[in-house]
Curated annotation (Swiss-Prot):
Compartments in which it is found: Secreted
GO biological process: defense response to Gram-positive bacterium
Function according to Swiss-Prot or TrEMBL: Weak wide spectrum antimicrobial activity against Gram-positive bacteria.
Record Pfam families: Antimicrobial20
Keyword Isomerase included in the entry's annotation: no
Source species of the chain: Ranoidea dahlii
Protein name, UniProt field: Dahlein-1.2
Amino acid sequence: GLFDIIKNIFSGL
């Protein structure tokens, strides 16, 4: 969902 995309961004930091 949308939160998965947000977690993906944090994973890339």
